[in-house]
Amino acid sequence: MQKRSKIVSILLDSLPHIKLFSGSTMVIKYGGAAQINPTLKEQFAIDIVLLYMLGIKPVIVHGGGKKITDLLGKLGIESKFVEGHRITCIDSMKIVEMVLSGDINKEITSFLNHHGVKAVGISGKDSSLLRAEPKDGGRFGYTGEVKEVKAEIIYNLLEKGFVPVIAPVAEGEEAGHPGYNINADTAASEIAKAIKARKVIFLTDTQGVLDGEGSLMESLTLSEVEENKRSGVINGGMIPKVDACVECVKGGVEKAHIIDGRVEHSLLLELFTSEGIGTEILRD
């Protein structure tokens, strides 16, 4: 009886959040351990099914950095990063596209379809969904910055009940261009702005944004993010993630969340419990 009462209590705690978010569009950046660990992959698919069944419209943007780095290493191509962004040469661009669009994208799509969601895997090149230009004038090679998102493609899929699964590879400026590798955090942010998503959620391999003592900061305003960057509390690989959060919140997204994808059912814990699990970033 006590166990049943606990289940009822959990459902009642979730109800206000379910009512609040039903009908909303949410962009979910899927990466890290949640994308590699077999158990977490299965649970992520189940979480997306539940969101879908509750009337939430998820849009998934995935990364694939570890698989890309591993395959490049096997081929004798060194991976280089500056400020958390990959430098992409012409040879590695071909590998990036193969891994993101041909391997990971289809695996995620298959998982979701297997669990009863109508998922459609697409690349940013499909129907010119993402158009890009070189990042920092070409300093990062074929790593690009998104300059256009064709939101109507995503709208059309959502209206027909599909869950878009998007590989962050963008179209180049002219026919025959190999395309651009887009940081998945940046791609998720730009897509969230373009489709006017209610939330964007980043699954990572850390609890969220941590303070100087290593404790989780549960909520940050835009100005607090900048303060923590200036002081060096936010540093390294967390910088591109918080920058992506800041950009989408400035662009009209209500809140951005950075959560620990290593925790089972972290998406549900963040969205449907009063305590949450990660860091939310919002306007001042």
From Swiss-Prot:
Query: So what does this thing catalyse?
Result: N-acetyl-L-glutamate + ATP = N-acetyl-L-glutamyl 5-phosphate + ADP
Superkingdom assignment: Bacteria
Q: What is this protein called?
A: Acetylglutamate kinase
**Signal sequence coordinates:** none
Localization per record: Cytoplasm
Which gene produces this protein? Answer: argB
Give the protein's function: Catalyzes the ATP-dependent phosphorylation of N-acetyl-L-glutamate.
Q: Which organism is it from?
A: Wolinella succinogenes (strain ATCC 29543 / DSM 1740 / CCUG 13145 / JCM 31913 / LMG 7466 / NCTC 11488 / FDC 602W)
Sorted alphabetically, which NCBIfam families does this protein's record hold?
argB
